[in-house]
Amino acid sequence: MTSPYLIVGLGNLGPEYTKTRHNIGYMAIDELLTRTSPMPATLTVHKKTNTLVAETRLGTQKVIVAKPRAFMNVTGPSVRKLADFFTVDRNRIVVLYDDLDLEFGAIKFRHGGGDHGHNGLKSITQALGTKDYIRGGIGIGRPPGRMAPKSFVLKPFSKIEQSELPIVCADAADEVEKITTSEL
């Protein structure tokens, strides 16, 4: 029997983070949920993993869609517990995250590889004990001037960026659908 896909969006819980660059993974998950069957799927608290989860389908493929409720830098244990609980093969985990190295709106998916300094990915790799999972980087651009990356990712998107977020999140969801409906 084929393992389901586990689609994880990275972000931080709390109203102060809702519209920040660091939460673009959560935003992409919200778009993805509108495409599931039954539509839209609803996230509920999975108590064993402290994660918001929906067991649903994209097309005919069973998927587990999740938003960890831990701060991004310590999401690894939640992702590991989810993968173990739902018996998900590591290479069928897809993590959506904010990528400083990509221009705003660019999308790049890759199987395996490094964490590129992203503490959420670092935590997941450490908890899973492997780099063999799919990373979906969603470009948020570089900080202006000498602004520290840590400050930049916790700032809200500009008005122009906010107007483009629906398209960016739709593009990320399109890529997830391609991955889950074809074998990489």
Swiss-Prot record:
Residue positions binding tRNA: Y17, F71, N73, N119
SUPFAM superfamilies, A to Z: Peptidyl-tRNA hydrolase-like (SSF53178)
Cystine pairs: none
Keywords, comma-separated and alphabetical: Cytoplasm, Hydrolase, RNA-binding, tRNA-binding
Name used for this protein in its record: Peptidyl-tRNA hydrolase
Sites marked Stabilizes the basic form of H active site to accept a proton: D98
Catalytic residues in the record: H22
BP terms from Gene Ontology: protein quality control for misfolded or incompletely synthesized proteins; rescue of stalled ribosome
Function: Hydrolyzes ribosome-free peptidyl-tRNAs (with 1 or more amino acids incorporated), which drop off the ribosome during protein synthesis, or as a result of ribosome stalling. Catalyzes the release of premature peptidyl moieties from peptidyl-tRNA molecules trapped in stalled 50S ribosomal subunits, and thus maintains levels of free tRNAs and 50S ribosomes.
Protein family per UniProt: Belongs to the PTH family.
Top-rank taxon: Bacteria
EC numbers for this chain: 3.1.1.29
GO molecular-function term, one example from the UniProt record: peptidyl-tRNA hydrolase activity
InterPro entries registered for this protein in UniProt: Pept_tRNA_hydro, Pept_tRNA_hydro_CS, Pept_tRNA_hydro_sf
Annotated localization: Cytoplasm
Enzyme class: hydrolase
Record text on subunit structure and interactions: Monomer.
UniProt GO cellular component terms: cytoplasm
Gene3D superfamilies per UniProt: Peptidyl-tRNA hydrolase
Reaction(s) catalysed by this chain's protein: an N-acyl-L-alpha-aminoacyl-tRNA + H2O = an N-acyl-L-amino acid + a tRNA + H(+)
Keyword Cytoplasm: yes
UniProt keyword annotation of Cytoplasm present: yes
